[in-house]
Design a protein with these regions (language model features):
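Positively charged
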Residues: 1-187
């Protein structure tokens, strides 16, 4: 089932999410709904807070990225991350223009480390520890920020934040056009 994406201004997007257990109600259904929702919105990552669930869960699929950097000759990843913990961010800082399904029509340059070491549980609650680099690392860091209650716009320069203030207020009020269902803070 395709769910509405919670828009900027929804309190759940600014809350640090809670860890979950294997017994979390309807977890596999939530994960399936997240995949459907993300693909419908043409996203490459989606965190549970973006569908209104304050739980430590996100999904990433970089296999279907349209504009992968040519020098990255990787297949990409398609993974579920449950109760993830970033153990280390390392490598060079690199800037890239990010966007977010919760903040439609806004993009901004964000600097992030090029590599990330992360521990997590997969969809079968099997423990994993992996190192990712490049776009995979970036998307993971972006989605991880969501479960920590942070949005990419918090990394933008003060001047850019001022410029975006009006657009962000419009998003809160639902005065934005996008091709997927959204739930807004102010009706």
């Amino acid at each position: 089932m395709i769910l509405p994406v919670f828009a900027f201004g929804q309190p759940v997007l600014n809350k640090k999410a809670d860890s979950i257990t294997k017994e979390y109600p309807e977890l596999h259904e939530i994960i399936e709904n997240m995949w459907e929702t993300m693909y419908e919105a043409s996203g490459i990552g989606l965190a549970a807070p973006q569908i209104g669930k304050a739980i430590r869960l996100f999904i990433v699929d970089t296999k279907q990225m349209k504009d992968k950097k040519k020098e990255e000759k990787k297949e990409g990843i398609k993974k579920v991350f449950i109760n993830p913990v970033i153990l280390e961010e390392f490598g060079n800082l690199w800037s890239y223009e990010e966007g977010c399904l919760s903040i439609p029509d806004i993009r901004g340059e964000v600097e992030r480390k090029s590599c990330v070491k992360i521990s997590y549980l997969d969809e079968n609650f099997e423990p994993r520890e992996d190192i990712f680099d490049g776009m995979e690392a970036r998307v993971i860091q972006h989605e991880y920020d969501h479960i920590e209650g942070r949005l990419f716009i918090e990394y933008l320069s003060p001047a850019r934040k001022i410029i975006l203030r009006g657009k962000l207020e419009n998003i809160k009020k639902g005065k934005v056009s996008c091709d997927y269902k959204m739930r807004f803070a102010i009706k």
